[in-house]
Amino acid sequence: MRHRVKRHKLGRYGSHRKSLLRNLSREIVEHGSIVTTTAKAKALKTFMDKLVSKAIEAATTDDRARSVHLRRQINAVLGDRRLTNKLVDEIAKNYVGRRGGYVRVLRIGFRRGDAAEMSLVQLVEASSQEG
């Protein structure tokens, strides 16, 4: 039974949805924030939280084999070793003490052409995690 099993389908078939989330995650790792529709932003938030959690584990684990395994998993999603290194070595270091909520979704209004609700998706700063 599929009770309470939810997935953001985004009106796309599986491989298209996977490709979309991979592309959006690449952009957010590279630029730090992006503007997209709210539905895509909500789907991206869960996707990126899982990716950053893997990056944190890869950055903090003492087991070299586990670290390499996690880096390879992240690289399979991002498809670019430079972005993988940036995520693990630079971004993940800021979130070591944090247990989730690495990505923020802020609604910013409606798109002019079709009135789709737009959101700003950004990585949460490390300084704001204290408190």
From Swiss-Prot:
Annotated GO biological process: translation
GO CC annotations on file: cytosolic large ribosomal subunit
A Gene Ontology molecular function term of the record: structural constituent of ribosome
Superkingdom classification of source: Bacteria
Keywords for the protein's UniProt record, in alphabetical order: Ribonucleoprotein, Ribosomal protein
InterPro entries: Ribosomal_bL17, Ribosomal_bL17_sf
Keyword Cell division applies: no
Family annotation (NCBIfam families): L17
Family: Belongs to the bacterial ribosomal protein bL17 family.
Summary of subunit composition and partner proteins: Part of the 50S ribosomal subunit. Contacts protein L32.
Name of the protein in its database record: Large ribosomal subunit protein bL17
Origin species: Thermotoga maritima (strain ATCC 43589 / DSM 3109 / JCM 10099 / NBRC 100826 / MSB8)
